[in-house]
Amino acid sequence: MKPVFLLLATLLLGPTAALRAADGPARKPNIILILTDDQGYGDLGRHGHPLLKTPHLDALHDQSVRFEQFYVSPSCSPTRAALLTGMHEFRNGVTHTTQPREHLNKEAILLPQLLLSAGYRTGFIGKWHLGGEGDHAPEKRGFEWCSTNVGGPNVHFDPVMVRNRKREPRKGYREDIFFDEAMAFIDEPKDAPFFCYLATYSPHAPLAAPEEFMAPFRGKVDAEEAAYLGMVANLDHNLGRLMRHLRERKLEDNTILVFMNDNGQTHGLDVFNAGMRGSKCTIWQGGSRALSFWKWAGKWSPHTVPNLTAHLDVLPTLCDLAGAPLPPPLGPKLEGFTLRPLLESATPIKWNDDRLLFHHVGRWPSGLGAAHKYAMASVQTGDLLLVRSRPCDDPACKQYSSQCTTLRSVEAGATAATYTKADAQFHWGVTPPGRWSLFDLKKDPACRNDLATERSELTAKLAASYDQWWDSLYPAMIRLGGDQGEPEPLSKGRAKKQK
């Protein structure tokens, strides 16, 4: 164990427990956290996809505790920041997917640091996207083993891999190699439980997969959609390889396997979106409702959980299950809750029924954060969604490329927009100016019937909670760089491209 984390263990656990952490505790559960990139909630057979066949994802679904109302942030880096800190991403300065606003606060305590201090060996494979240089890099944030590829999402085949700072050319498809790396990390002969964070690039653009995975979709959808679906099919194949690997090594019964995605639907939006409105980078359900399958074969019976849950809950849950205490300064800052009661109860239970979950798309032009307080924001409680899907009102924003650019074009009547060729009015739907809209997700999952006028008192109450939330985090967000950088001029013509 590295000295800095042995010190952290001493602070968290006391000297005796810290020594035990250094030696490695017996029979703590192994943990594998798989995070896919841009996969939609509907992108598997069990959720009704008309074209995708995903036998391994379907099997995991059937064997898992399934959180059917689990939410992430509407885009990539923000979700990763919230996932690893248990706090809304804005509180740690992450408001975009571009530098410097993707950089996660260097002072934040991350999940791998807590697990390392509790005796786990920690491995990261794949996409980081929280600042890859200097003290932002994963090897400086609690990961002992780090493996990724040179060129990120742009190199699909025969990548140069970097494992623990050593470069090695590899043959094959990038995601196959990522799963190979995860299995190599799992197989390291060390007497300690492991935490493996496997973050894929698939099915994020640019889109490409081995032909055998794209072939079933050719002629049924266009080439872009066939490549996207092929990437998901390849992920399913690799999930099957990993699950078989755990069985063969007799690790299945003592390994917690968590599978989730980082944001909503992208290039498969026009094919299937599970009846939801919205895509990645929108504030609608389709932008943030996520897969969340939790399997511990030796402990939990498969069941479906209807409670409102989120990426914020991953850190407190895994620390609880791993016996990793939270340092006193961190506990009050956490916005997530342990899911353990929901994982262990096969019947529905009351659990944080008054929870308020706040979302904001972020991604505004740098320097214009204050003007975007009410642009693309939402509050969710139970089955109710309070939402504003509007461009900001600041004239300065119009000269830059942002989500506001797309919303202005949709408000002007455009039918095509990012990720959709003909249904922008629905998926990028613009709400009325100057007010919030309210929807009952249970009765109206597509969010077509606005209840704000009918339920005006509740609307006002939720709107006030949003104001309080934004005002509480805004100073820290600004201090930690959430509004820094140079805005992207609209003349670059990248309004329809998303990272």
Regions found by a protein language model. Give the residues of each.
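Non-catalytic accessory segments flanking enzyme active sites
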Residues: 473-474
